């Protein structure tokens, strides 16, 4: 639900709702009219507050646990809070310094992603998640081919960010070592510094225009590159801190927690959510059922895309209970995205 769909609330009601949700996030206990009368900063009686809370419950922003006279926010209530009531608390200078120092020590993209997810988990006390840039977006530095047997070839691919990938490919024909060396020399001389997708497209285009001996070399290059230069997706997402959720009171249902950990293990659902946010500027928040997945109805996901050299590379975020400190985590996620993007622009990373 977006802010434009929120019910119209007068200033007094907004202040009561803001105070109630902030107190509930802090304490984890249902909030009653007496507590609000003491802490909302309004000159109204508990009886008046009770009437307002009843109205907020009628429109679906609050609910009443059976065992308490107080009220707690619904997912709808959290959405209104996040969209229009929360008062942001940006990370302090020391937190920003920690982020920058940790990410500055990363050696290569995968190391940076791991550091970013660990820092997000440590600073949020929940799960940190970072989607990896697609390898198609990265420039390759060097390639070598080694014949393993009559049908299989080992492709050793070094990217500009110092990552190395070894891939076993099965080309259409057997190649002599001298042929493999010739193709590798050609690819390194012509395409070092180019993105993978550009290389494949360029090879096919040149093959259509080539003749005689050059045509044979290009045909061999296309044959080998068609498999060797296809991006691998084994490291498509990095997560850290999943076990932190085991100590969260709001996620104490073991069956639901087991479902959540199965989602973490498969990664597919989390990646789908991150993909939905990759082109959205700024922070995007999914609260409970907004994820569209039953197994994630008890959690919230706060995400932001990270960019380098003007290009969106991926998304990072925090996964935690719906009762999370949005005022602190929303700006933290945005800051982490900015810092990671800056680190990705450092020489030797891309």
UniProtKB/Swiss-Prot annotation:
Keyword Transcription: yes
Molecular function terms from GO: DNA binding
Keyword Repressor: yes
GO BP term, pick one: negative regulation of DNA-templated transcription
InterPro entries assigned to the protein according to its UniProt record, in alphabetical order: GAF-like_dom_sf (IPR029016), HrcA (IPR002571), HrcA_C (IPR021153), WH-like_DNA-bd_sf (IPR036388), WH_DNA-bd_sf (IPR036390), WHTH_HrcA_DNA-bd (IPR005104), WHTH_transcript_rep_HrcA_IDD (IPR023120)
Physiological role: Negative regulator of class I heat shock genes (grpE-dnaK-dnaJ and groELS operons). Prevents heat-shock induction of these operons.
PANTHER family assigned to the protein according to its UniProt record, in alphabetical order: HEAT-INDUCIBLE TRANSCRIPTION REPRESSOR HRCA
UniProt family annotation: Belongs to the HrcA family.
The protein's name: Heat-inducible transcription repressor HrcA
Record lineage: Bacteria, Pseudomonadati, Pseudomonadota, Gammaproteobacteria, Lysobacterales
């Amino acid at each position: 639900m977006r802010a434009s769909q929120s019910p119209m609330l007068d200033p007094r009601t907004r202040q009561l709702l803001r105070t109630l949700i902030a107190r509930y996030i802090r304490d984890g206990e249902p909030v009653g009219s007496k507590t609000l009368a003491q802490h909302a900063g309004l000159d109204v009686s508990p009886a008046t507050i009770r009437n307002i809370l009843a109205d907020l419950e009628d429109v679906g922003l609050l609910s009443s646990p059976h065992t308490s006279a107080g009220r707690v926010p619904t997912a709808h209530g959290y959405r209104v809070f996040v969209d229009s009531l929360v008062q942001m608390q940006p990370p302090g200078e020391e937190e920003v310094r920690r982020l920058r120092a940790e990410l500055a020590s990363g050696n290569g993209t995968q190391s940076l992603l791991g550091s970013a997810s660990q820092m997000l988990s440590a600073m949020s006390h929940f799960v940190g998640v970072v989607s990896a840039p697609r390898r198609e977006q990265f420039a390759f530095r060097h390639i070598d081919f080694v014949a393993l047997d009559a049908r299989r070839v080992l492709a050793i691919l070094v990217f500009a960010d110092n990552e190395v990938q070894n891939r076993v490919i099965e080309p259409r024909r057997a190649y002599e070592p001298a042929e493999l060396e010739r193709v590798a020399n050609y690819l390194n001389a012509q395409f070092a510094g180019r993105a993978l997708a550009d290389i494949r497209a360029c090879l096919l285009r040149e093959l259509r225009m080539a003749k005689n001996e050059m045509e044979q070399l290009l045909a061999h290059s296309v044959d080998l590159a068609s498999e060797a230069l296809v991006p691998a997706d084994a490291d498509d997402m990095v997560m850290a801190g999943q076990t932190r959720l085991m100590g969260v009171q709001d996620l104490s249902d073991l069956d639901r927690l087991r479902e959540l950990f199965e989602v973490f293990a498969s990664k597919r659902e989390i990646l789908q959510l991150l993909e939905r946010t990759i082109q959205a500027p700024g922070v995007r928040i999914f609260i409970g059922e907004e994820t569209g997945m039953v197994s994630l109805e008890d959690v919230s996901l706060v995400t932001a895309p990270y960019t380098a050299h003007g290009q969106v590379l991926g998304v990072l975020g925090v996964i935690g209970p719906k009762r999370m400190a949005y005022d602190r985590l929303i700006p933290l996620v945005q800051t982490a995205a900015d810092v990671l993007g800056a680190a990705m622009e450092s020489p030797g990373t891309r």
